[in-house]
């Protein structure tokens, strides 16, 4: 299974530098100078390998220069490229209360009394903390704060997350 660790948002400047939205908790390792990344090109363009030549932080995003991308036109053509890693290459997590996002995506969510809420479609990382984006009935999105007071148990074996939502949380949309 492949996991997205970043996305090219846009070109930055005229020398081929790219603004990358980071979707990994270890950007220093993933996007280190000399790293080789697999990028899935937008609009069915296939995949390509990218070698990081330089990297710096700017306004909450990484600005990265890749080998072979030397001007704005070349950089613009890469907008929307997703950087992927194979989940088998990820190190195991030793803490039983920590999970990779992809382990939670697809799990059923139910309340403590067993009522079905929906399925986790993605884990959102926001400045205020992590949220579980849960698709409920009629494809309605419910954002559940990923905190121990609400998310009471996670069973990867049973593919279930149990929540104890505060009053009104499930009524918001």
From Swiss-Prot:
Annotated family: Belongs to the RimM family.
Record field: transmembrane: none
Main subcellular location: cytoplasm
PANTHER family noted in UniProt: RIBOSOME MATURATION FACTOR RIMM
Pfam families, alphabetized: PRC_RimM, RimM
Species this chain originates from: Mycobacteroides abscessus (strain ATCC 19977 / DSM 44196 / CCUG 20993 / CIP 104536 / JCM 13569 / NCTC 13031 / TMC 1543 / L948) (Mycobacterium abscessus)
GO cellular component: cytoplasm; ribosome
Gene that this sequence comes from: rimM
Subunit structure and binding partners: Binds ribosomal protein uS19.
Domain notes: The PRC barrel domain binds ribosomal protein uS19.
Entry GO MF terms: ribosome binding
GO aspect biological process, one term: rRNA processing
Entry keyword set: Chaperone, Cytoplasm, Ribosome biogenesis, rRNA processing
Identification of the protein by name: Ribosome maturation factor RimM
Subcellular location: Cytoplasm
Function: An accessory protein needed during the final step in the assembly of 30S ribosomal subunit, possibly for assembly of the head region. Essential for efficient processing of 16S rRNA. May be needed both before and after RbfA during the maturation of 16S rRNA. It has affinity for free ribosomal 30S subunits but not for 70S ribosomes.
Annotated PRC barrel domain residues: 95-169
